[in-house]
Amino acid sequence: MAGRSCLELGLFCWVLLAVPVGPQPASSVPGAPLTTLTPPPQSEASMLSLNLGLNFKFHLRGPAAVWGNPVTETHPLSPGLGQESEEEEEGDLRTDPLWELLVGSPGNYLPEWGSAEGSFTPWASSLPPESTSRLSGPTKRPTAHSQPRMGTVTWATALTATAPPTSAPRPHQSELELKFDVALRAGAAPTLGHRSLPLLPSLRASLAEIAGRLGPFGFFGTTVSPLRNFSRQSYPGTTAHPSFAFEVSDSPGLFGTTGSRPPPLLERKFSSPSLLDSVASPSSASVKTTPVQQDPTVSTSGPDELSPASFGNPSTQPGCEPGSCSEPELLDDLGQPPASPLPLFFLTLEADWAEARARWGLAWEAHVYGAGALFGLVALLALLALALLPWRCPPGAPCLALLDLLLLSAGTTRAFPLFYDAYGHRDRLPTLVWLLLQDLPLPCLAAGLGLACLLLARPRTPRCPAGLAALLLLGLGLAAAAALGSAVHRPLRPLRLASRGLHAFLAAFLSGLLLALSCWGGRRRRAGAPLGGAGFKGATPVPQVRSPFAPRESWRRAARTAPVAGTFGLLSGALQGYEVLHALGYGSQAGLEGPWPWWAFQLGLRLGEVGVALPLALLGLYPALCSPRVPRRCWAKLFRLSPGHAAPLLPGGWVPGIPDKEPLGSAIARGDAELLQLCALAGPGPDLLLQGGGCRGFEGAGANPTQSTASSPSSDCTVDFRPPSPINLRRSIEEALCSEALLAPGLFQGPAFGEALPGLGLYRTISLGNKIGAGPSEKSENVPGSPAPPELPSPGAWPPGSSASSGSLCGLSRDSSSMLLCSSPDRPPRCPLVCVLSPPRPSESSPSLPASGSYQALSPPSRDSPEHASELQAEEALLQEQFLDACRQIDELSMGSDTIDL
């Protein structure tokens, strides 16, 4: 005995100096509930490395009672220590009954420790079959121990660290030490020719062990395996056999334990496995399945084991009748497993729909119909904006139309499945259609966020860049390919994770960018000055095409709406990212499974998507409803296919054909600039606008006024009127009155011309004076009292040959700044305006009453008129009253700034 004790002590010290590094956990494959562990082939150059976790593992093993009753009673220790030492010196590990008990059949070997395919722990081969780890709590069924076969190590014995049953006898201390040494020796692995110092740890093996312990399952905490999903109803008549128990590895991860994979019969009971059921551990190739022999009359679901009811199934599991759960029947079922349905969710429901809806009650209805109504509202707003865009044509209409189309698609694809078959609980939709409806709205919302960033970032009209279009097409293509691949080929299911992860990243990034742009409004460059500002003079400037949010009020509305979309976009991206991590096995905590956490998570996803889509729909509706200007209709542009649809632009006579009556003032000479059409040139070309009237940029339109070509006396100051009137009414008014200063402000666009052109006379009066001075029938004498050139010529009668010589006279205005036409005393007073518009409405009111608005009355005739002053005063009063009445009629009958409706 003393020699044997010394030999045992020496062997124990040798093991302490050189102990192998702990192996990685061996994972299971689908359809393999019970497996055996196989050691790797031995090599001649074997070296044991120091195990860093020796003390920790030895502490977890506990006292000698962990060996349990089956080990101490079934297999006596047959080999002697001398024989074992000889085997160790020779390098040939033969099998013995104890070795068969620990690792299985003689042909199987333990994998190399520290490699990619490793066993679980050095002590894993000697663990009892009972399991104390659970995920959902104990069941109410009686306890019984499942007895493994001789020479076979099951997952319950190899991957579970438990305490011995109370009925197990405590073995002798010497047997404990001997078996402890044998377990260490059995776990010894070669280094395949690589020699290292026995006292130094193997860094490669230690890192491999740490990586095996921490990933992919159990990194953040207690994780229910993503390889199962219980969110759909079970097939009728399909039950899980009680002889297959769900085993749980008690290997401590970073913060807790990790649930291993259930057998396929359990997946058949809960018929929605998760997305990554094709993901398996590296050691899945060397796994052999063996069913458990048990007494059929005794139930195997104890408080320390997991039953299907512990995963949320409310239905009672029928027990096996005597002889009904025999081994051949189980093998037949395993040989032809039914095709498991496609996983629809990344987060498991952990219950069937009947129990879940019973727990939710009205919360389920509020979730489904409330979210569906909100998505329907998004679709209606997008449709309304699309209908209004052709009639208003705001700047940036193509980008706004694309934004509305994306929101319409996202709203309809979310609202329809919620109303028709919410989350697929009724199985009304095909799997491929359901997956497409779930995945396609995400790239649409991400592209909508990108378009919103473009609309807010540019002061000018945005154009959809090729990068955003390519990103949209990439997202849509990836989502469609992931849904199609998941429905057709199960190994392609990780594509859904890639698609969802990409959209989560894009949603978070673009939402943060949108928040930054909306908060950057204070430093944003001013898009343009309002019309009629301090720097504006003269004709109406040609409006530049700008961003739909260039006006201040539109920008304020957008700045109040965009941060809401950005905030909810960040929330949606975070939830989608967590969903992807949970599908990979990270992020789950104990107590977060069940119907209510699933309901809250799905509600958060829907609210995040609605919070992004609804503000974006309002953002696209603002320019169509609240555009600061009313431009030309887009439908008119579309249907105006030929130039004949518009009024012809005629130079010279301005009227096609020979006029019936020679217009008033036809003898007025016109320069070359006056032969231009009555339409302002919006494109590049000669500057025909008045002083300060051109839009030379967003700022400083009037800061640097320059003399334009239209500022000369020979130019026509009516070239900015557009479009030309079919009856040339505007030209007739101008020629009859010789000045736009008589018109009310705002009548034909822009401010009052009297304010716009201070100190500038009527340019055509100079040409009139030139005509009078250079006409062949004119007398050469000068009228006394006329100012000297270059001042305006003195007023006088029209030339005898003109058609207006008997109807009007020419006179100076009150401030002597322009020459006006006055009625002739030879005939009764008449006004061409009143004759054209409506009969005169004489009034007995005093002619000295101030004119309404800012109308300017005609000046009295000059002092050189042959008529007496007493006769002319009455005529002047009546003429002024008629003129003011005509101006009022023009204001009442004018429509906008384009034409005059008679």
UniProtKB/Swiss-Prot annotation:
Compartment annotation: Membrane
Compositionally biased intervals (Polar residues): 122-136, 281-302, 704-717
Stretch forming the signal peptide: 1-18
Keywords: Membrane, Phosphoprotein, Signal, Transmembrane, Transmembrane helix
Record-annotated membrane-spanning stretches: 371-391, 393-413, 432-452, 468-488, 501-521
UniProt GO cellular component terms: membrane
Region listing for Disordered, in residue ranges: 72-92, 121-149, 281-333, 701-723, 774-811, 839-872
Biased amino acid composition, Low complexity: 799-811, 843-854
Superkingdom: Eukaryota
Comp. bias (Pro residues): 786-798
Topology within the bilayer: Multi-pass membrane protein
Name this polypeptide is given: Proline-rich transmembrane protein 4
